[in-house]
Amino acid sequence: MRVFGKINIIGLDNGYGNIKTANGIFPASVTCCEAEPAHAQDVLVYDGKYYVIGAGHREFTLDKVGNQDHYLLTLAGIGQELWCNQLTTAAVHLAVGLPLTWVGDQREQFRAYLSQNRHVDFNWRGINYHVDLVGVDVYAQGYSAVIPELRKFTGANMLCDIGNGTMIVMAINDRKPV
């Protein structure tokens, strides 16, 4: 997480196998429970429902917005980052990734999906969080990993992002993705 003024920028990789942030990684699975789970550690409470996060494995689908799973996983990722930075109330701008081949078709849909609530209250691992979601940017997965070193990418280069169900290859010519 990076702080610019009063805005907390959280980078989050919404993978199919795992959700990754700067300070954590957990399996990308969601199980809804009727009552508070007795022994689960990674519990998200949102909209009056209990969700166990990371206790299983999701099936691969081509659409991340078909249900609430990736929204809930994103809330857990936000909670993880805020906890690591000792915050419970924050203005958050998300920087998230989609596979390169999906960015063109799904960028706006995924941005709208993650932006469905400007003000979000939830509980992650027993701590209440209050988030003002001020923005969402969607990037090609893997590209963010090379941005700090982009000045070194002269000539023709290839970036390979291997995920759980995806493998994306991106050409980078003279510091620009093609």
Walk through the language-model features, giving the residues of each.
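Nucleotide/phosphate-binding catalytic cleft detector across ATP-hydrolyzing
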Residues: 1-159, 175-178
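Active-site-proximal alpha-helical scaffolds that flank and shape metal-associated catalytic sites
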Residues: 160-165
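Short, acidic (Asp/Glu-rich) active-site segment that either coordinates a divalent metal cofactor
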Residues: 168-173
